[in-house]
Amino acid sequence: PNAMRTHFNFTELKDVLKWKTTDYDVLYSHLPEHTDQLVNLFSNNTNITPKVVGYCHWYEVPENTAYNKTMLMANFAGMLEMEECGVNSEWLKSLVLEKAGDIYQDTYVDKLKNIIQPHYLGIDKVDMKSKPKGKSIVFNHRDNDYTGFRWFVKQMDKLYEKRQDFTVYTTLTDMNKPYSKRMKIHSRDEYLKFLKTMRVGVGCFDKYSAWSIATTDSLSMGVPYVLPNKLCYPEMVGKDYPLLYDKDF
């Protein structure tokens, strides 16, 4: 599943670089797992030493993956080669430094602390005039454990026992429930237009959520979201946001 983090074709990449006729000032890496190898390629096989910067939105940690083996150590090694590595949030930076502290001495953790910096993801369109239709709830997240999908379905089942006047809309998975409907959407404009018809959105993230574009997409279209008062969400919407909840599940 994590082959993109493990596979590095040194020979092919060296040929593609055409380094004898092309100069490189900056190396930008979105996969820190490859950065150590990229720096090695440039340093030992060319006469070019570009500055290295990057970004990482996903770290293989127990909170979000059940792999027997991960590429986290390669990720750390890659980030240590960077001038700066952007991450989605302060929450994610804190989590990564905590994991690094289990392995490295303080000297290296402090170096990572200076390298890793939050680079908040923006939104490409804002239209706060939502036009909700009916009692509609949107769950536009993956059906993974870290998104709280199974817990969410159980809560909707309980709600359906009490009332049958609502519809849950999903965009990435089928719930196969009498109260649910999956939307098959073919463009971003169509997706944003659909979001504007939702009454409320829900985020049930439990142990891991460094950011949620699904949430910011909906907020930018004027859709209020019920969100956990932990992970990145107080940072995203502000601690005084009225729809943060504290209950764990």
Task: Put a short name on every predicted segment.
Residues 17-37, 53-54, 200-203:
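Short N-terminal targeting/anchoring amphipathic segment
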Residues 26-28, 41-63, 79, 84-86:
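Active-site proximal beta-strand in glycosyltransferases
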Residues 78-113:
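A short, active-site helix/loop in glycosyltransferases that binds the activated sugar's phosphate group
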Residues 91-92, 110-128, 175:
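Short beta-strand->alpha-helix junction loop in the catalytic core
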Residues 124-126, 133-178, 188:
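Conserved catalytic-core segment of nucleotide-activated headgroup transferases in glycan assembly
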Residues 192, 215-220, 234-235:
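Short alpha-helical segment that forms part of, or immediately flanks, the ligand-binding pocket
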Residues 196-210, 223:
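Acidic donor-binding loop of glycosyltransferase active sites
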Residues 239-249:
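Conserved acidic donor-binding segment of nucleotide-sugar-dependent glycosyltransferases
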